[in-house]
């Protein structure tokens, strides 16, 4: 019928995460994966998975202060989200519009002017980005964030 069908990135990762053709997933998917990992490793009694979607980077610093990094959504290389979207139909027939340049990083620190990330994209490693730019890119991708909290 010429229509493209695909999975819901709130539930699963569309595509291959090891290939540039993969898309990405959102916080609820990562929450499930982290919970499964904690259960498998016998660590669910020690940690709680927390979906902190809706919080700014500044608000997430409380976790960094407690020694806990945050899985953080922004954009590839902290560039603007393009206007164009990739579209596909979900199983229920809903049109899903993917915001391009979605990227997941690990927020690991901050100082007066920057947030610090472990960034797997092109082996960037630990990198600093200006706070205002980070907040803009985080908001553009939906303010998704996931972390662990010690019980």
Locations of the language-model features?
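Cysteine-nucleophile protease catalytic domains, especially the papain-like/related folds used
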Residues: 1-68, 125-126, 149-151
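Structural recognition of the beta-strand scaffold that forms the well-ordered cores
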Residues: 48-49, 69-74, 106, 116-118
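Short regulatory "switch" loops immediately downstream of catalytic or recognition motifs
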Residues: 36-40, 75-88
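Generic intrinsically disordered, low-complexity segments enriched for polar/acidic and small residues
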Residues: 2, 7-10, 20-23, 44, ...
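Catalytic-core segments of thiol-dependent peptidases
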Residues: 38, 60-64, 68-76, 92-99
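Noncatalytic regulatory segments and standalone regulatory/sensor domains
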Residues: 80, 84-99, 104, 108-151
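Generic detector of bulky aromatic hydrophobic side chains
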Residues: 8-16, 26, 76, 83, ...
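Short secondary-structure junctions and interdomain/linker hinges
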Residues: 41, 70-71, 141, 145
């Amino acid at each position: 019928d010429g229509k493209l069908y695909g999975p819901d990135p709130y539930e699963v990762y569309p595509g291959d995460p090891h290939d540039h053709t993969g898309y990405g997933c959102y916080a609820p998917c990562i929450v499930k994966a982290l919970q499964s990992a904690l259960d498998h490793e016998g660590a669910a009694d020690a940690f709680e998975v927390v979906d902190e979607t809706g919080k700014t980077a500044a608000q997430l610093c409380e976790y960094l202060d407690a020694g806990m990094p945050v899985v953080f959504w922004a954009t590839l290389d902290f560039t603007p989200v393009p206007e164009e979207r990739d579209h596909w139909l979900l199983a229920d027939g809903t049109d899903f519009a993917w915001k391009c340049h979605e990227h997941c990083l690990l927020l690991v620190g901050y100082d007066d002017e920057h947030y610090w990330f472990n960034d797997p994209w092109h082996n960037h490693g630990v990198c600093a980005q200006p706070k205002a730019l980070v907040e803009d890119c985080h908001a553009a991708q939906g303010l998704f964030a996931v972390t662990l909290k010690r019980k």
